Amino acid sequence: MQTAVDETNKYQRQNATSNIGKTAAWYDTTMEELYVFFDTTILMGLNQKNRIKDYWSTDKLITTPIFGELFTRDRYLSILRYLHFADNNTEEESKLRKIKPVMEYLRAKFERAVTLWENLCVDESLMLWKGRLGFKQCIPSKRHRFGVKLFMLCDCDTKFILNFIVYTAEQKQKSTIIQS
């Protein structure tokens, strides 16, 4: 998580073109603040609204006061704008270079959480994605037809993901599903 804090603060300094407007109020984020940011984002998934700004609305019909208690709207949007997990100055050419630290962190946590059992399966999954992305896939037979294709190694008994590969349609997949 400290890497995300450092890279977010660095990315903001690299891209703050002027001290005018909402970026003038930027102050470096902390690990505690990023934890609250991710908690808020998960809470938004549980209480869905049409626009991000609606979570901080004072309209009596759609108000949700918890979001205002966790963050101001402008601070949340600032962190969302500058959130970064990897250094932009790296020479790596992979399409996943910006989220590679997160993927490696998740793989390590998955590996520590569960030991391998006998009943394993490799599953293809499509994670919904509506934005622009160079490796977005279209699979007409899936419920969400457009998204990011994943191959996951799962334990059939516990339903736990042991490892995963994000399909990017690159010539060589550098990561392997079963690590030695």
Regions found by a protein language model. Give the residues of each.
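N-terminal initiation segments
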Residues: 1-179
